[in-house]
Amino acid sequence: MDYSTSDLCDHFADVVDVLEPMFINFGGRHSFGGRIKTVKCFENNELIRELLSQDGTDLVLLIDGGGSTRRALIDIELAELALENNWQGIIVYGAVRHVDEIEELDLGIQAIASIPVAADSQGAGEDGIGVNFAGVSFFDDDFIYADSTGIVLSAEELELEIVEI
């Protein structure tokens, strides 16, 4: 479903948190959202691969990469894996690579930067935990909505059908 985060902020100002404006759209789907699954890992994407291998129907993977821009946590292989397993999108507090290929996919991907250097795959990290970045605290099963204007978070699913676009 396409929507505008600006309209969501107008209609749901009392129930949404707005992330600080630091994210860039890299995926081919510019409006995406869903229930979040959290993962925290630093310059290492093995746990990300494990999560994206699971069914992601109506889910957005929210990655706390510590804001590191030294190594890309998402590459074309992981983005294609997410698409194959029906993930709505990925939000990375960190970097991505293979940007030209990723923008061709019908998948929402936002991150703070791109870099050609790959992440390690040592298996370190935690999933299903609360994380905090961009001025907001995130928990598994919160709802996130993203577009080219910004990203908003809600503890409950928003009734998008009442918003006129």
Curated annotation (Swiss-Prot):
Pfam families cross-referenced by the UniProt entry: RraA-like
Any one GO molecular function term: enzyme binding
Gene3D superfamilies: Ribonuclease E inhibitor RraA/RraA-like
A GO biological-process term: regulation of RNA metabolic process
Keyword annotations from UniProtKB, A to Z: Cytoplasm
Transmembrane annotation, as ranges: none
Cellular component GO terms held in the UniProt record: cytoplasm
Localization, UniProt: Cytoplasm
Family named by the database record: Belongs to the RraA family.
Subunit structure of this chain's protein: Homotrimer. Binds to both RNA-binding sites in the C-terminal region of Rne and to RhlB.
Function, in words: Globally modulates RNA abundance by binding to RNase E (Rne) and regulating its endonucleolytic activity. Can modulate Rne action in a substrate-dependent manner by altering the composition of the degradosome. Modulates RNA-binding and helicase activities of the degradosome.
Descriptive protein name: Regulator of ribonuclease activity A
Gene: rraA
